Regions:
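Basic, Lys/Arg-enriched alpha-helical interface segments
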Residues: 1-73, 83-85, 93-120
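Short, conserved beta-strand/beta-arch hydrophobic-aromatic motifs that form part
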Residues: 90
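Short, surface-exposed beta-strand/loop micro-motifs that present aromatic residues
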Residues: 76-79
Length: 120
């Protein structure tokens, strides 16, 4: 079993947590939001239970220690920290075949910020 943490910027804000909370609220009356919310939560649970030992349609290594969870058209970036923890960084809705470079760069910047503040 692994520990999953949500990245928070230096002001204590987690965009991913806020996004999931918004989806959870919308899911009461919106079927698409309900499906997205359940998929993302399931994939986070799979990561927590199995680590990166999941099929590539669930998780994929991108580069430089940055991974992505792949629930539907959503992508949730994360990295492994201290061997038994995963830090969930941010998400975006994938609209093209290739993951946009700016999203990967943002994930790397968030990871570097986390490591600078929390330590290797």
């Amino acid at each position: 079993m692994y520990t999953v943490e949500f990245y928070e910027n230096d002001r204590g804000v987690s965009e991913l947590w806020d996004f999931l909370e918004e989806l959870r609220i919308k899911s009461a009356s919106n079927k698409d939001a309900r499906i997205q919310y359940k998929q993302i939560v399931l994939y986070i649970q799979l990561l927590q239970d199995n680590g990166t030992r999941l099929s590539e349609n669930v998780t994929k290594h991108l580069m430089d220690g940055i991974w992505e969870l792949r629930p539907g058209n959503n992508r949730v970036f994360y990295f492994c920290w201290r061997g038994d923890r995963f830090v969930l960084l941010h998400q975006f809705r994938k609209r093209s075949q290739k993951t946009p470079r700016r999203e990967i760069e943002r994930a790397k910047a968030d990871r570097d910020d986390w490591l600078a503040r929390k330590g290797e």
